A protein has these predicted regions:
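Positively charged, low-complexity terminal tracts
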Residues: 17-143
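Sec-dependent N-terminal signal peptides
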Residues: 4-13
């Protein structure tokens, strides 16, 4: 009788060891801009799916460090970001590329004679220059 009780107690635990939890693997593909205001392009591999994310520090919060992540379900969605940046590069001041989850606005700083972009996600906001956009465009095209 003791053997049956022991078997019924051990078998469920032995069976659960066959089911391993596989956590998503995240790797940085490109560091667009380093600290203190980082922007990183990441690849997230979860079982059979590969998705991408743009991680950036929210510039609306100055009292602390808040990192926001803009997810892209697949490479095609990431290419839409590249197409939007390419179109805005050829555009004018105030042009906006609007998507379901985010928008990119082109702004120009007249004194510095440079082009800036404002990326607004679901909860965060970051700015980046044309040189950083070019780095992001060329890397996405190479994927």
């Amino acid at each position: 009788m003791k053997k049956f009780i022991l078997i019924f107690l051990i078998i469920p635990f032995a069976g659960f060891t066959a089911f391993k939890l596989i956590y998503p693997s995240t790797s940085n593909l490109l560091e667009v801009r380093p600290d203190p205001w980082p922007i990183n392009l990441q690849r997230v591999i979860d079982r059979r799916d590969t998705s991408y994310a743009l991680e950036f520090r929210d510039q609306q919060v100055l009292s602390g460090v808040v990192l926001d992540t803009l997810p892209f379900a697949n490479l095609q969605q990431l290419r839409y970001l590249e197409q939007g940046l390419t179109a805005l590069k050829k555009g004018h001041n105030g042009d906006i590329a609007t998507y379901d989850d985010y928008s990119i606005k082109r702004t120009e700083v007249i004194k510095k004679d440079s082009i800036w972009y404002m990326l607004r996600g679901a909860g965060g906001l970051t700015n980046f220059q044309q040189s950083e956009a070019d780095k992001l465009i060329s890397f996405i095209r190479s994927l």
